[in-house]
Amino acid sequence: SKCGIFAETDANTLVKTGVPVEEIIASLFEAVVYQNLATLTKGNTPAPEVLLLGGPNLFFKGLQEAWRHHLGKLWEQRKVVLPQGQDAASLITVPAEALYYACLGCVEIGAGEPEGVAVYQGRDRLRWWVEEGQQEEKARSGGRALVAGADDLTSFVAEYDVKRPAAVGAKAIGPVLIGCDFGSTTAKAVVLSPARDLLFSCYALSKGNPIEDAQSLFRQVREAGYPEVGGLALTGYGKDLLKDVVGADIAVVETVAHATGTLHFHPDADVICDVGGTDVKIMILRQGTVADFRLNSQCSSGNGAFLQGVAERYAIPLEAYAEKAFEAKAMPTLAMGCGVFLQSDIVNQQRKGWAAEEIMAALAAVLPVNVWIYAGQLQNLGAVGRKFVLQGGTHRNMAVVKAQVDFIRGKVPEAEVVLHPFSGEAGAIGAALCAADWREGTGGRASRFRGYEAIAALTYTSTTAPATVCKWCPINCTRTFIDVQLPGAAGRPWSKLPLAAGWERVISGNSCPKGLVEDVNELREVKAKLEEVKREYPNVAEMVRKDAFRRSRADAPAVAG
């Protein structure tokens, strides 16, 4: 159990690794109950009877069952005496009026007030507040808009709303290089020529299943007319699951992919700020390599999915977000920090009369604060560099770009802030460039790519059960076995969950390489490889620790002799 906003990232990761949706939903219900019992009750024991109120408790039967299960278990553990003849489940009630108990409470309190208290004053006061009073309140509490005026917007658009360079679109002479980025909310693919020219790109919202996302992307690449593949690299959440399934040559760590994709266009970049659907990555570069890295590891308050959710609640297409936000003549000041509290702040600003475009502008304005200060913990931007590159799908939103530019230049007046020409596909481009490096480094070795027809015909099953739990250490990771039908696969007839010939098993949910195997002989091979890595790459930190506490010869006590 943790922050509800960041839990979305966990759910997306589980979907990408093949965990069934129904199991993820059940886990979310469990997390809600754990959070309430562990945090809100502060060690106290809810006494029978218990009322479950509010919309989620009323409409989600699974949440009701989670409450009944865990409260019953808690009462049993703490030896709570239940009324005679009643079981725990019968003492947990969801009334039909669960949505309206706060309203009913207001009625009860009002009925108990002395006569003459809180007498209805008519609609004139309310009308005045709607038409005039809230405008005065807004003027006192709000701030300037994202754009100071028409001239400010015109100059910004002239500098940043430059049409990105189009893909060449020509047919490649020779095998192409493909890079795919399977992100939390989107899937992207790019095609490079042997000369590393961009030939084709596609960008789509994720369907929530990595194999289906891969089928969709490769179908588009095939239809674009690139039959011969010389190298394939994957990055993003789904890379490890899909590498063997589609026959990728390499799986590239996200930081490496994004840095490579940026340095190809901006070799003198100092800082890369990548804002995606559910994560924020800040990469600080020194001499063309990543010297420091910041990730929102415990909160996703600065992500793009939050902006998308707010736009959807206002029934505004995401593509129209910036246009709507730029219409605002003023905007409220939203609090930096936790996305859950930020949502509460938005509701509070709505009560004050702020319109949709004003709140959307304010949300774009607070995003850089959350990205750099709250998530990145970077107070002094001037210390990290002078050239900042903005990328990631969220930076397709020009309102966010405007807010980022103003924030960075407010901290570093001489900063050069540039927008990646392919902000959404930067990771995929980096992966494709890594595929090109792999092909050159191997002397043109044939790619492992399985082929468009094989990927289109993929069928699979997913299993998470007691038999899939890893037993190689006390952690007991809950793994998921994803079995994919592939021609020529050997199967695993000896497994606890036998797999027939013609099927390949991909294991996800493990915390270490040992979790990728089922058989003890396979485990011995993994351990041997790990020992080989230790021998080849010494543990420098351990060497420094030993050297720091080793007594030097000069300090050693003299030996009597």
Identify the role of each PLM range.
Residues 37, 41-44, 103-107, 158-173, ...:
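Conserved phosphate-binding catalytic cores of ATP/NTP-utilizing and phosphoryl-transfer enzymes
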